[in-house]
C-alpha cells in the first residue's frame, strides 16, 4: 500500500519536451550515421537509453510498461529478423551453387556501363511490380546487378540507387504487396486497389523521370577504367572457378515460382536456399558438410583470381548478425517513443496550423518520412500518420486515397534508405553500400515526392469528396 502511495502519477509528454527529445535523438543517431566514428547501432542504443531514462525519470512511465512496448515492437518485426537470417543462407548457397556467378558472368558479357543503370533499374522494377517481393529480389537479382556494376566500373552509389529504386517498386504499387493495403486501411479507405490506381498518377511520371535520369547519369558518370579492364579477367575467373550450367538458375526460378504460387515468402526463401545447397553438391562438386557450414559462416571464394574472390566472399547467417542487432535496437527505440507518445503530439500540433490541401499533403509527406525514420517501418508509420490525418483529410473533403498514396509511396522508398530500418539494413548488408551514399540518387523517389505535392497544390489528380461522402465517412469514424 505504501509503495502505491509513493509511486508518482504517470503524465503525458508536452510538446516542448517532445521536440527537445526528438532533436536530441535525431542528433545522436545522425552523428553515428554520418560521422562513422562508431556503428549506427550504438547511436540508436544511446538514443534508446536516453528515451528510456527520460520516460522513467520525467514522465514516470514504469520500466514494465516500456519493456512491454519494446517486446511488442520487436515481435512486430520478427519476420524481418528471421528473413535476414535466411537471406544470409541464400547469399552463401546461391554463390556456392553457381547461381550468382552465372548471373555475374552473363551480365558482364551482355551489359556495358552506358546502359547498365538503365537496365538494372528497368529489370528490377518489372520483377518487383510482378512479384511484390523486394526482399526476395534484393539478395538475388539485386546482388547480381551490384556485382556486375562493380566489375564494369560503375560507381557504387549510382548502381545501388538504380537497384534499390527498382527493387522497392513492389512496395509502392504492386497488387501483391501489403504496404499499399495497410496504408489504405490506416487512411480509412479500405480500398487498396483504388489507392494503387491513385498512386500510379504521380508514380508513372516519376518512373519516366527515373529512366531518363539514370540514362543521363550513365552518359556522364566517370567510369573506373581499372574495373572495365578487369571485366575480362573476372569472366575468366568465373568460368574457371564454377560450372556455369544454365541449371544453376534453378534456385532463382524456384523463388519466382513460389512467389507466383502465393507460397509464404519466409519458407519460400528457405526452400530456395536448400535448392542452392543441393546444386552446390551436384553441379559444383562441393562437400555437403562444407556447403552447410558456409550457410552459417559465409562463402569463401578461393578461385585464385583476386577480383572474383573479392566479389564472391560473402553471405552466411553470421554476416547478418550485426544487421539483426541493429534492428533489435532500432525497433526497441521505436517501441519506446511510441509509448512516450512523442510523434503523436508533434504531428498533432503541426496539423492544427495547416490551411491548404498542398500544405497538408506536404506535411503528411514530411511526417511520413519522420515516422519511418523513428519507427523503422513504412507500415507502422502509416498506422501512426493515418490515425492523426484521417479526419483532417475528410474534413477538407480530400479523398482518403490521397492520404494513403502519400504515406505508402513515400514510406516504402524512404524505408530502403535508412540503415536502421529493416529494408534499409537489408540493402546495406546485401549491397555493401552505405545507404546515405545513394539516397540523393534515388531519382524516382524524389520525383514522385515532388510530383505528388505539386498535384496537391494545383488540384491535379487530387480526388475530392462530395459533402455527403465526407459526412458519411466522418459519421463512420465516430461509430
Roles of regions detected by a PLM:
Residues 14-28, 37-59, 81-86, 118, ...:
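Hydrophobic mid-bilayer segments of alpha-helices in multi-pass membrane transport proteins
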Residues 4-9, 28-38, 99-115, 156-159, ...:
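Inter-helical loop and helix-membrane interface segments of multi-pass membrane transporters/permeases
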Residues 34-36, 172-180, 184-236, 416-417, ...:
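Juxtamembrane and boundary regions of transmembrane helices in multi-pass small-molecule transporters
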Residues 82-90, 112-144, 330, 343-388:
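Hydrophobic alpha-helical transmembrane segments of multi-pass integral membrane proteins
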Residues 114-127, 153-169, 173, 359-372, ...:
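Alpha-helical transmembrane segments of multi-pass membrane proteins
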Residues 41, 45, 65-101, 114, ...:
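Core transmembrane alpha-helical segments of multi-pass membrane transporters/permeases
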Residues 75-80, 105-122, 150-159, 241-249, ...:
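Membrane-interfacial loop-to-helix junctions in multi-pass transporters
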Amino acid at each position: 500500500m505504501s509503495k502505491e502511495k509513493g509511486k508518482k502519477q504517470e503524465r503525458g509528454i508536452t510538446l516542448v519536451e517532445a521536440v527537445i527529445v526528438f532533436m536530441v535523438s535525431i542528433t545522436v543517431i545522425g552523428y553515428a550515421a554520418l560521422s562513422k566514428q562508431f556503428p549506427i547501432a550504438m547511436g540508436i542504443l544511446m538514443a534508446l537509453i536516453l528515451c528510456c531514462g527520460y520516460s522513467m525519470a520525467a514522465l514516470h512511465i514504469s520500466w514494465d510498461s516500456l519493456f512491454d512496448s519494446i517486446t511488442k515492437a520487436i515481435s512486430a518485426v520478427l519476420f524481418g529478423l528471421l528473413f535476414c537470417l535466411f537471406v544470409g543462407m541464400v547469399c552463401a548457397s546461391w554463390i556456392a551453387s553457381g547461381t550468382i556467378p552465372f548471373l555475374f558472368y552473363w551480365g558482364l558479357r551482355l551489359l556495358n556501363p552506358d546502359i547498365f543503370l538503365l537496365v538494372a533499374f528497368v529489370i528490377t522494377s518489372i520483377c518487383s511490380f510482378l512479384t511484390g517481393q523486394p526482399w526476395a529480389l534484393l539478395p538475388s537479382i539485386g546482388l547480381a546487378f551490384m556485382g556486375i556494376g562493380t566489375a564494369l566500373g560503375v560507381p557504387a552509389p549510382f548502381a545501388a540507387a538504380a537497384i534499390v529504386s527498382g527493387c522497392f517498386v513492389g512496395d509502392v504499387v504492386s497488387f501483391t504487396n501489403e504496404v499499399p493495403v495497410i496504408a489504405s486501411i490506416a487512411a480509412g479507405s479500405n480500398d487498396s486497389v483504388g489507392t494503387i490506381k491513385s498512386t500510379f498518377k504521380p508514380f508513372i511520371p516519376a518512373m519516366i523521370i527515373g529512366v531518363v535520369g539514370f540514362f543521363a547519369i550513365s552518359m556522364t558518370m566517370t567510369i573506373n577504367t581499372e574495373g572495365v579492364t578487369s571485366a575480362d579477367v573476372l569472366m575468366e575467373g568465373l568460368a574457371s572457378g564454377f560450372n556455369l550450367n544454365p541449371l544453376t538458375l534453378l534456385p532463382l526460378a524456384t523463388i519466382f515460382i513460389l512467389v507466383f504460387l502465393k507460397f509464404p515468402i519466409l519458407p519460400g526463401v528457405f526452400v530456395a536456399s536448400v535448392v542452392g545447397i543441393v546444386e552446390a553438391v551436384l553441379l559444383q562438386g562441393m562437400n555437403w558438410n562444407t556447403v552447410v557450414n558456409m550457410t552459417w559462416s559465409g562463402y569463401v571464394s578461393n578461385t585464385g583470381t583476386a577480383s572474383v574472390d573479392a566479389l564472391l566472399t560473402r553471405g552466411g547467417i553470421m554476416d547478418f548478425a550485426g544487421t539483426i542487432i541493429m534492428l533489435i535496437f532500432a525497433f526497441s527505440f521505436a517501441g519506446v517513443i511510441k509509448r512516450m507518445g512523442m510523434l503523436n503530439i508533434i504531428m498533432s500540433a503541426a496539423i492544427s496550423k495547416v490551411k491548404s490541401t498542398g500544405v497538408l499533403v506536404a506535411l503528411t509527406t514530411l511526417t511520413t518520412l519522420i515516422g519511418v525514420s523513428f519507427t523503422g517501418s513504412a507500415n507502422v508509420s502509416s498506422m501512426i500518420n493515418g490515425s492523426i490525418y484521417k479526419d483532417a483529410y475528410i474534413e477538407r473533403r480530400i479523398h482518403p486515397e490521397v492520404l494513403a498514396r502519400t504515406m505508402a509511396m513515400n514510406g516504402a522508398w524512404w524505408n530502403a534508405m535508412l540503415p536502421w530500418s529493416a529494408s534499409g539494413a537489408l540493402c546495406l548488408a546485401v549491397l555493401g553500400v552505405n545507404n546515405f551514399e545513394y539516397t540523393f540518387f534515388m531519382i524516382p523517389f524524389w520525383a514522385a515526392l515532388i510530383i505528388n505535392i505539386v498535384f496537391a497544390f494545383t488540384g491535379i489528380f487530387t480526388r475530392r469528396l462530395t459533402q455527403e461522402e465526407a459526412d458519411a465517412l466522418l459519421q463512420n469514424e465516430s461509430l
